[in-house]
């Protein structure tokens, strides 16, 4: 570890925190202190990820801010207050960045790090008590055989980058963390229609880890939860489907074990 501090700029969407987790951990070992930015809505998950690393400092944006780049006023404030620091950036902090397919590898290229370093940092800080509490509440309604499904539908806010809705045909109850999956279906007599409650919503997506690991099936779009999946133990999940046109196997080799469902074609 050297005596320099590091301001590390990377994209702030929820999934980016998992994509860039290895880079933060790497820099945490190299620098005396590492300063990263976080959207207000992601604060609980990001704080949990790094709470065991005293030299990782998280700067949280205003509650109304929802851009994937850190606010310039906070960046400038950091630069003026932190002595002996370097600024390291990835993504669109460089206006020439190529955000086409495979952008995740280019994030690491910008940092002069091999993308394979991600496989060296696959441990994340989990809160078993919170996970089990949420799991028990949900399976108390849905039962122990259920589908975990996630796309960009959310009753709390509208995502700025909407993905096509994910639909499945199954007799198993479908749990969506951010909306009643059955609320948009015409048949309100569906036996699973009234299982969901907004009380099952958590402001920390890490709370769903146990629920995901114990699900019968997983169906997700390329989103924050798909970025979380490589960190979980999914060996007992009978079916895993991701709905995307991206080359997700290059994102993480674990997706070789998934059904990759093309969308919009």
What are these model-derived regions, one by one?
Residues 1-265:
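Catalytic machinery of carbohydrate-active enzymes
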């Amino acid at each position: 570890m050297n005596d320099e501090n590091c301001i590390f700029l990377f994209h702030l969407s929820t999934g980016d925190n998992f994509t860039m987790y290895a880079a933060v951990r790497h820099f945490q070992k190299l620098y005396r202190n590492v300063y990263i930015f976080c959207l207000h809505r992601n604060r609980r998950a990001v704080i949990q990820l790094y709470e065991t690393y005293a030299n990782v400092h998280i700067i949280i944006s205003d509650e109304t801010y929802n851009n994937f780049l850190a606010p310039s006023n906070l960046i400038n404030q950091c630069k003026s207050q932190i002595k002996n620091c370097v600024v390291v950036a990835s993504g669109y902090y460089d206006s020439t960045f190529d955000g086409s397919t495979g952008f995740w590898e280019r994030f690491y290229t910008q940092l002069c790090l091999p993308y394979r370093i991600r496989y060296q940092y696959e441990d994340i800080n989990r809160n078993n008590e919170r996970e089990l509490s949420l799991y028990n509440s949900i399976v108390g309604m849905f039962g122990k055989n259920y589908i975990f499904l996630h796309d960009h539908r959310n009753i709390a806010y509208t995502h700025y980058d909407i993905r096509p809705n994910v639909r499945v045909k199954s007799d198993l109850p479908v749990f969506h963390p951010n909306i009643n999956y059955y609320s948009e279906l015409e048949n309100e007599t569906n036996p699973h229609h009234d299982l969901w409650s907004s009380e099952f919503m958590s402001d920390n997506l890490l709370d769903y880890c146990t629920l995901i690991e114990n699900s019968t099936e997983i169906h997700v779009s390329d989103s924050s939860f798909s970025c979380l999946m490589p960190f979980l133990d999914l060996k007992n999940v009978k079916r895993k489907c991701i709905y995307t046109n991206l080359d997700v196997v290059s994102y993480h080799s674990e997706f070789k074990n998934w059904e990759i469902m093309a969308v919009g074609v």
